[in-house]
Structures are given as structure tokens and as C-alpha cells.
Amino acid sequence: MTSQYVTEPPSSGLVDLVTSKGTISIALFPTQAPLACRNFLTLALEGFYDNLVFHRLIPNFILQTGDPSATGTGGESIYGEPFPIESHSRLKFNRRGLLGMAANQDRTNESQFFLTLDATPELTGKHTLMGKVEGKSIYTLVELVEGVELVDGDRPRYPIKLHEVRVVENPFDDLQPRTTKKQRIAEERRKKHEMETRVAEEQKRKRSKAKKNTGLLSFGAEEEAEDEVALKGPKSSHDLLKDDKHLSRQTIETSKSTKANTPAVSANISSKEKRFLAQSSSSTTPPAVTKQASKDGTSDAPHPTATLKSEHSGPSDQKASSSTGRDFLASQRAKYLSSSHPSTAKQDDSYSALLSFQSRLRTRPSSTTPIAKPLPSVGVDEVEEEAGEYGASDDDDDWRSHRLDAGGQPLVAGQNAGKDTLEDYEVLDPRDHTDRERNPKAESSRDGKRGRDWVEHDRKYQNDRSRRHREHDKHPQQRRQRSII
């Protein structure tokens, strides 16, 4: 492995591939591959590789990008045409992390390039090797292809994005980009707009009406038949089927006799309704018409399609359609609708009953029979017995005139009802250490005195106390004699 690094030529120039999973640093070989490196750096400075995707991934082989169309067939060259492959004896695809140019079928290069994911000696001499991955960014390359799901062999389902190819060190002093990134973006937008306009004009030209060919032998009849405009909206079987034997060719009969003698056909009629229709049709059919129909062997009943169409068109004669099943269905439907909703008479009766009940409650006179109040020393059973003795009744009609009396004094009474007085509250101030109730004279004597007066008062009190002590010490014999006596 060391011999491989020794044989490789020194690199000059550095670029960064900014991908969706990190940055990959690449050192270039501009001396051994000048055409490829100059083309690669110029396209990078012009912003050609910005926001592309890695459109091809072969595990343990290569990771390819550089095609704006993401199909593997696009790309461009700064030379105006593809340039040839540049091979060198000291550059070989013998490990992963090598940068090479993707060649066309005619062994020429444009803008597509790839990174090797393993040793690929079969590519040596067939593709231009122009760079290698530098430093720890090789781990970013490994992470870039890890866990990628492939479809159609080598296309990632969710392609990895190449945000930018940033030129860190340019090895060519005379290299100048043909245009800036902003100019390239504006040019791409202009080309895209021109392409969209061209496509819209082509579609409009195709939609334009072609000129009729009047030289046909049928004098343009076939041409007119081909140019029929297709109608939009729902179509019936008459529009789609030209010669259908299941469709009726007879016109709809609207005479009164036909309507009177033809029962309507409905798929939703029950057996009971069918019997009613049979009776009504037999009773309303004249005998002459019946005989004539039996002789001819034909029936005057129209096709079901015509019958349904006549039903949708609406009745034309009220008297003639009175015996048909349609009127029967209408009457049954009206009967059902009338029975499904509550009648207004029942609602009025319920409302009047409610009003009468409210009036009885409000007009009932209050009972004047006194009810005994329970005493605190009397039990519950005794209270019930006394209530029965004093006229308490369990009548059902008497509950409306009953008055609830809980007894006792009212909570709010008198003139000061609802008003607070000072006697209702007791103020306890923990900061007040004096006892005003026990020594009211001292409290009253304090009123009107200043701080200096209080100092003189305390001094006088101390002098009186010291004088009493001195007198007590001068006459101990007199105190002893007094105690003996």
C-alpha cells in the first residue's frame, strides 16, 4: 500500500463537494490531467454543478453525477465538444475515494464524473483519473452511499443531492470562467421559457382545425363525418350504439287512450300494488280494444324505455292518468308523509293541557291549616304523629297548596338587617403589646405627652425608687422592732 502512495504524483488544487450528508474534500492532479481538471474547475466556478443529484450508484463500485438531466446522457464541455481521455502510468484506480471522468461510448468526456467506492482496476486506462479524496472526508463518502435504496438496478429511489462544487484552491492562474452563476441561472430560465413557449405553440397548432379535403369522391361527406365534434357530458345508449336490436324504434305515443290503457312499469312496486294495477287496468280497458288486440296478436304496451321517458316527461292529462300505478304510488307516498309527521291537533291538545295545569297551580289557594313544628326533644315518629293530629294530610290534591315552613328565627331581621356593626368584629393586632383594658388610666395619661415628657417621667420614677431604698437601709432597727411588735 505504501508503494502505491509513493508512485502517485503530487497533487495541487483543492475543491469541496458540498453534499446533502456532508462535505468531501478532493485534491486534483492538474499536471497529469490538464484538460479534465480545467473543464471541471471552470464548470464549478460557473455554477454548473449546483443542485444536481447523484443519479447513478453501483455498490462497491462507483457513485456518479454531473448530468443536469439526471439521465446519464446529458452534460456539456467548455471546449464546445467532448474531449479525449487522459491516462497516466502513475495514476491507477486501485482504491476507493478516487475522482474520475465518466466517458461516453466513443471514449470522450464532458461534465459527468464519478467517485470510486472500492478498487476498480478495470477502469484504469479507460477513464481519466483527475483527483483523490483527502483526509477524513473519506468517511463522508462512505456515509453518503450507506443504506441507499436502488430502483431499476443503479438508480437511487431518493437521490443524494450535490449542492455545490466549491473551488478552494485553483491550480491554474489563467483560468477564467465564461460566465457567472447569476448569468447562468438567467440564461437557463430564458431557455426554459423559450422551450415552454415552443411546446405550447406546437400543441396549439395541433389543436387547430385541419382544412377539409373537398376532392373526395363522396363530395366531402366522409370528411364531414370525420370532423364531428364529440359532445361532452353523459351519453346514452342511443348515442353510442348505432344499430342495437334491444332498443325500440317506435316513437312514444302520447294519446289519451294509450296512456289510459298502459300501466306504468316500476321496479319498486310490491306484489300488492301489482294486483291493484292489474284490477284497475282490467276494469278500465274497453272490451272492443281487448278483442282487437287479441285478433291482431300485438300489444299496445310501449317499450319500457319509452314508458320511463314518459314518466319523466310528466302527466299530460289528469283524468286519463288517475287509474295508473303512478297515481297509486303518489297517493301512497302522500299518505305516508301525512302519517309520519305528528298532527297539529295533537300538538294543540298537549299545549292546552300544559296551560291548564299551570293555571291550576297558580290559582290554588294556600292552605291555612297550621302545621305543628317539631320540638328538639321529640323524636321523628312522634313528630309525624303530631303532624297527623294537627291536620297534616296525605291527599294528592293537597300538595299544590302545601307551604314549607322550616321554623326558627329568620336569619335577617330588624332595621339593621344586612348591615355590619363594629360589635360583630374583634380586632386582634399582634403589634399592640399594651393592655388598654387593664390600665385605662395609664393609657389616658399618655395622651398628649411628648417624647421629652416621657424621659422626665422615667427619670423622676427612678429617683423616687432610689430614695426609698436608701431610707430602707438607714433604719434597719426600726423595721426589726416593728416586726417584733
UniProtKB/Swiss-Prot annotation:
Residues 173-485 are annotated as: Disordered. It comes from the Eukaryota. The keyword Cytoplasm applies. It is found in: Cytoplasm; Nucleus. InterPro entries: Cyclophilin-like_dom_sf, Cyclophilin-type_PPIase_CS, Cyclophilin-type_PPIase_dom, Cyclophilin_A-like. Its EC number is 5.2.1.8. It is an enzyme of class 5 (isomerase). It catalyses: [protein]-peptidylproline (omega=180) = [protein]-peptidylproline (omega=0). GO terms for cellular component: catalytic step 2 spliceosome; cytoplasm. Residues 184-204, 236-247, 428-465 have a biased composition (Basic and acidic residues). Residues 381-398 have a biased composition (Acidic residues). SUPFAM superfamilies: Cyclophilin-like. Residues 11-167 form the PPIase cyclophilin-type domain. GO terms for molecular function: peptidyl-prolyl cis-trans isomerase activity. Residues 249-270, 278-292, 315-325, 353-370 have a biased composition (Polar residues). Residues 466-485 have a biased composition (Basic residues). Keywords: Cytoplasm, Isomerase, mRNA processing, mRNA splicing, Nucleus, Rotamase, Spliceosome. Gene3D superfamilies: Cyclophilin-like (2.40.100.10). Signal peptide: none annotated. Belongs to the cyclophilin-type PPIase family. CWC27 subfamily. Associated with the spliceosome. PPIases accelerate the folding of proteins. It catalyzes the cis-trans isomerization of proline imidic peptide bonds in oligopeptides. Involved in pre-mRNA splicing. PANTHER family: PEPTIDYL-PROLYL CIS-TRANS ISOMERASE-RELATED, SPLICEOSOME-ASSOCIATED PROTEIN CWC27 HOMOLOG. This is Peptidyl-prolyl isomerase CWC27. It comes from Mycosarcoma maydis.
